[in-house]
Amino acid sequence: MDEIINKYQAVEKLFKEIQQGLAAYDQYKTLISEMMHYNNHIKQEYFNFLMIISPYLIRAHSGETLRNKVNNEIKRLILVENINTKISKTLVSVNFLLQKKLSTDGVKTKNMWCTNNPMLQVKTAHNLFKQLCDTQSKTQWVQTLKYKECKYCHTDMVFNTTQFGLQCPNCGCIQELMGTIFDETHFYNHDGQKAKSGIFNPNRHYRFWIEHILGRNSEQELGTKQDPCGTKVLQQLKKIIKRDNKCIALLTVENIRKMLKEINRTDLNNCVSLILRKLTGVGPPQISESILLRGEYIFTEAIKIREKVCKKGRINRNYYPYYIYKIFDAILPPNDTTNRRILQYIHLQGNDTLANNDSEWESICMELPEIKWKPTDRTHCVHFF
């Protein structure tokens, strides 16, 4: 970013020197006018560049971690917006204009190093142009981005075609590759094969459930056409709470699910975390991005292993919140009481289903070194709240 700003400032200084040099000659009035056109053009580009990066510069003052993230995003924007190319094109046009006009006019000067010598300004323009448009310099600047290196654990990332980007094999961090086209021939129907309706993407399921477990989903999901904000549902739940003399501060996921069943709104079971936050004023813990990414990576690996070891005769349907519960129960330290509150917001199924899931999870953990198997204890998370 600083390099781009320095380029714009250097170009502005260059234009000023050229115009001052040419002002001593009457025959260069047309050239000065044309130079003014390019000067205004590059000033507009500089203004647009500042408008693009200004929101990121404000965020950069929020801390060292966010500052590094913002700097990487600004570097990506510079590449996407082709800022270097735009500057180079303008410089090429100006350089061509100067060479053409000055050579055809054939003005002779007595002293080559006179301060008002326009040829001296041309020489300065040539030197600056070579400096700014040097191909090797630009290549070295691009290489410093290291887009394949994970920003969390600094290991080489691998391509993930289902995510259309790069994924870290250690922490699971996913980096989208803008403007990249992947070979999708393996998605197409081949002769003798039945076409599938869609591509299974475990990451999509993980993000859906994490969004709902953490209560980050839209409040519009609670509403209907007649009640867009879900006010009626919340009023019905408050009446039940008052009727049963329930303590709002002690409401649980199971309490909300039972009340939703009573008012025939079990379609909102996925929104229990959001409802709890609306009723109690206390929401789920805000898990850090690094922990969520690690959980996503383990979740994806667990689903892949499950497809290989799943028992015959069982319905091929996963209850994804169970997997998320087991993953966060394993990766969150016992003394991390704040983040372990997430377990309170995950509904677990009946005892028989839970026992079958635990048996299947044990088989998955045998091939999943990140997780150590242990049976699910429904009361395990009670002392954290």
Swiss-Prot record:
GO terms under biological process: regulation of viral transcription
Disulfide bridge positions per record: none
Organism: African swine fever virus (isolate Warthog/Namibia/Wart80/1980)
MF terms (GO), sorted A to Z: zinc ion binding
Zinc finger (C2H2-type): 166-190
Protein name per the record: Zinc finger protein B385R
Membership in a protein family: Belongs to the asfivirus B385R family.
Protein keywords: Late protein, Metal-binding, Zinc, Zinc-finger
InterPro entries from the UniProt entry: Poxvirus_VLTF3, VLTF-3_Zn_ribbon
Induction per the UniProt record: Expressed in the late phase of the viral replicative cycle.
Pfam families, per database record: A2L_zn_ribbon, Pox_VLTF3
Domain of life: Viruses
Zinc-finger recorded as keyword: yes
